[in-house]
Amino acid sequence: MASTPEEQLVKAVEIASNAAAVSDADLVAQALAFLEQLKQVTHESWSVGWTIWTARTEDGSAPKYEHAPRLFGLNLVDEFLDKHIHSVSEAVNALAFLQESALAYLQSEFVHGHGEQGIVFMKNKLAQTLSLLMVQTYSLSSSYSFLSAALSLCTTHPSADTDSGLNVMATDLMMRVLHDLSLSLGSDATLRSVRGKDRLQRDALVRDEIRTHHAASMAELMWRVIQDSLRTLQIPDAGGTTTASSPQQLTAGNAGPLASVAMAVVGDYASWIDISLVVTIDTVQILYNALDAQHMPLRYATADTLCEIVSKGMKPADKLGLIECLRLDTVLTQLELSTRGQGEAQTELREHLARLVNALCTELCKIAEDTTGAQADTRDAAHTKLLVFLQPALSFLADEYDEPAEQVLPCLHLVLSLYKKTKRQNENMGLPSLSAPTLEFVTQLIALALQKLKFDADIDWQDSSLVGGPADADADESEDDDEQLVRFYELRKQLQVILGAIAAIDEPLVSNTIQTLVANTLGSVASPTELPWEQAEVCLYAAFSCGEILSSIRGNKIGLGAHSYVQIPSEPGKAPARNVRQSLSVYQALPPNTLGEILQLLFRSRIGDHAHPVVQLQYFECVVRYASCFVLWSDLLPNALEAFLDQRGLCQPHLGMRRRLNYLFYRFVRDTRTAIPSEIVPRLLESLPLAVNAVLPEVPPEEDVLVKATEKASAFDSQLYLFESCGLLMSQLGHVPETQVMLFKAMTQPLVEQLLQVVQAFGGDPDNLQLVLQVHHLILALSTITKGFPDYDMNRPTEPAWIEELKPITEQILLALTALNRFSIVREAARGAFARIVTSAGPAVLPYIPTLIHALVHQVTEAELVDLLNFFGLITHKYKDNVRSVMDDVFGVLVTRIFSFLNQGIQGTDDMVRRSDTERAYFGLVHALLSAGLDDVLVSEKNQGQLESVLQSHVYYASHGEPVTQRAAISALAWLVQLWARPSEKAIPGFEQFVYDAILPLVFQVPTKPSFDQSDAQAQLVLSELAGLLKSLHTARGDEFLHYLSSIYLPGVQCPPELAVELTKNIQSLDVKPLKRYLDTFIAQSRGGA
């Protein structure tokens, strides 16, 4: 390493920043370690860092070192000033040195020099350091002259002969310093919210000092910079061609950027210095001039600064006076009008102006609803002024670009909330709900909101979510919508919220406006198919949104239904009974309400015939949202079903749309199946595209193609909705069982035959993975049909005839599983298939379960076994005695497999999670058996050989498991005690001794383990289970148990006699909850005694 500290630092930075080019890895490591050490000791290294930053070449014309070491050096100074200066004994001297050296450096570089060559990131870094230095000035010094001295450089020039105008280089730097200083002191609310109490107190003290000593001179300088820059910009030939005799002079070329920076600084300080320094007769005119300047960034900065000014915390009356003083209504109206329709050139300015309008309206809303801090006349004046600014707000909302519109949305939400409160207050006082100007504004807002819902005709809709995704299977399905579309979706969402807020104020106004939009759109052409696609789509979307809007404001608790579309009469003095269900015939006799009229108009038109994909998909979305209206008015059904079944719907060539439509058709059938005539069901089934064709994806050689094919939703997963729809349709034919069975066979037999053929083909070609995927698909397709049927009803007097037809399906699935059980996707499909089939068919297919288990059990992974155990828990709970023989057949096999996993070692976190799942599933199965009254399965001839292992596993996990597992194991043991430990015919030989030898000790061993934390909530739950176990033991064995406990067990573990007597009394007299509390105390006393 080099000799001096400065040279060492420079060399280390050079090595570290070019590590890839250094062949000696040890040297790089030394350099990085050296630099890290410097960062740890900035109370010593700061001076080296500052020296490197200020060092010059021998002739003084340029910095001595490169950017990287200089920036690193300045970082050391920053760290010292920000966190460590107060911990050094010579803090005041260090501060004085840095102040003096900094002023000398600024004089040299920004008055006489080249201002760091104008490099922005170097100036920004320096500004950050100087702002930290200024903050510490107020903490460690009683002299506050440093800031004044630094600001004076803004008018200091290298030659005494130069006029006293601004020094542009120094001024530009000081504006950056002032900006950083304000941010550092908390002008940014986000930064302020994450700071600690001490930092906030320090910042407040520094702000007070600056307000007292420097605010006036700072404000004077900022306004002078802006005013001088504006004058320079107005000089003829101010297009930037004018050259300066020195870089310090103000010219048309640098005036605009300098004024923009200074204006932004005014915005920084507006929130915390006296408003009289920011807003005066002169400064208001400067602001107007800046808003009208030719330099666009200055106009942006001015609008943003005005936002900061009007958002300043003030008393309501003072704030209203400030807004009136600024007289921005006329200015903003003129600027909005002059920039309207100018294309992208003015869009950014309009965005900033819209933000200013939003700030003004927001502040006026706050004043208008402040009933505690504002007088009535102040609130009334705010209401009046608000209406003035709402006109430019509406104009910005109507902008052809979305960016300005987005800026005024927050204030529109607030305004509507204010008007909702105002309406309620006026009605309570017997006054008109809303004034005429307010009502006019709301009416205009509805029209504009509906207008803004419309897509641009040139939007990129292809392969987007507007049409369900990519058009073909080769496209990337995970590709997100482009940013423009995502932003428009968000805008639509906000506009819908606005429409909902207006509906809360005046529901008929919104519904009637939407009705007019739909009627005018459909009536504007001879056929809706002639409409421009974006006009047809917004007509559909407005209708689509209407139901949600009206339901939300009506407090509809039962969702959209027949009641939503008709005029429900109300009893005198009562609101319509919208949340009370009536019979369908009652609603069919009532006239349609506005929403009903909209839907009748829409669905009786031919708008669904429109050729554009976006319109087609929105039509189907609308049909599904209002599916219940097709039940109410069944004459609308044929058109909707026809659209679903032809090229517009399920036969659509566009893959993305077809996937979405499969789901929508399922939703529609599910919600309208009671209205679909049974005679058209066969034709519907015949029209569905149900061909199953498994396609293997292209994958790299190292990937598992079957996993890839099934790891995320595919086209086939979407097609499964059609198979479920088949089940839904056929389930409605229970009144014609012959037809139902015929159709069920017609639907399933081809699939069963194909499954048989594919399995046979696989036998001759066992490496053909496409055949494996085809088997997976066919199993799922067959089982998903049954998912459309209702759950099996145990109380039904006769079994539906179609259930008998499930048996050959089940048998073929088992044959396929047996042949391909080495493939996890086939095992998963078979498990899922049985879960669905058993749910619908009930006991009829339970005899096939042992075959399923034997085909699966030796191949399943631990995760698969957990799913299988959960499945058995469910069917045991549902079918109870009906599964006795099945469980007797499979329990032993399952337990053997469970123990094989539980006895394996654990390698990492994933293994721990899986093991925990296995334990819970195991005990869940045992609980299911016990709750179903199938405890005799555990001791049957087939399973009694494993009984001891099962019992010992419960004892083990009661003592060593996680709290959740412990509770499950203890609970099961308590249950077994109740069942088997009583003196009765059901008593299990040897179990009584097991109770005393193994189960009873758990009550005292578990809570005395070092790992048992009595203060932990989970541990307390375990203690509750132990208390329950004690009660079960006493209930089962009575006095014998109490005698054994007090005379044999407790003395054997050195329990004091008095404690033993107390415990036995409490076991007899207390319920589980108080006994648990006592047990908690007993354990604590026992530990204390030990």
UniProtKB/Swiss-Prot annotation:
Leader sequence residues: none
Cellular-component GO terms for this entry: cytoplasm; nuclear matrix; nuclear pore
Record-linked InterPro entries: ARM-like (IPR011989), ARM-type_fold (IPR016024), Exportin-1/Importin-b-like (IPR013598), Exportin-T_C (IPR045546), XPOT (IPR040017)
Pfam families found in the cross-reference section: Exportin-T, Xpo1
Single GO MF annotation: tRNA binding
Coiled coil feature spans: none
Family the UniProt entry places it in: Belongs to the exportin family.
Protein's name in the database: Exportin-T
Classification lineage: Eukaryota, Fungi, Dikarya, Basidiomycota, Ustilaginomycotina
